[in-house]
């Protein structure tokens, strides 16, 4: 994924009201950005960090600038736009960069499924193969080289795991993909210290046939690409 037009650089002043952030540009202008991330963003929003933002061509938007990446003062890149996790995963599947998800010729997005009336991020289909249901999660919480999900209690994430267990029980392929969007992370675990129920459900889901995968994105202010498998400890 190439950023076109190129991202612009600023310095973070503060994030507030979850969806807003104030930054100062190199010429001293103060801007308010849209922050497309409802999570705690622990370690991703420290005042003084470098922010890379995109600008919408839609002149009717109240906040036309969107926070895409954080470049921390230690040099790590973090993609804070949670929408990018799905886009990167879709691109990687279509370009056959994820061998575990190769061999399908149809990809559908936002398909309704499950007893709790959810929408799956992606469904893959091919002749003579079970349908493959994929839920994608964005991983940005880092403690040293360890990456964790979630960064706050997620009842929605718990629901998705229950739904995937139902998919597996019905004979389909069920997959959760953790998209690691922090350059300092080298391994992944569920965040038991934040949401013990989610961690327990993830282990249960794996035991009941749900595949748990994690891939890391190469991140820069110019482009992003999801391709590197990451070790998982449940």
Curated annotation (Swiss-Prot):
This is Sugar fermentation stimulation protein A. Belongs to the SfsA family. The gene is sfsA. PANTHER family: SUGAR FERMENTATION STIMULATION PROTEIN A. Binds to DNA non-specifically. Could be a regulatory factor involved in maltose metabolism. CDD domains: SfsA-like_bacterial (cd22359). The keyword Aminoacyl-tRNA synthetase does not apply. Residues 201-220 bind DNA. Gene3D superfamilies: 2.40.50.580, 3.40.1350.60. NCBIfam families: sfsA. One of its GO terms (molecular function) is DNA binding. Keywords: DNA-binding.
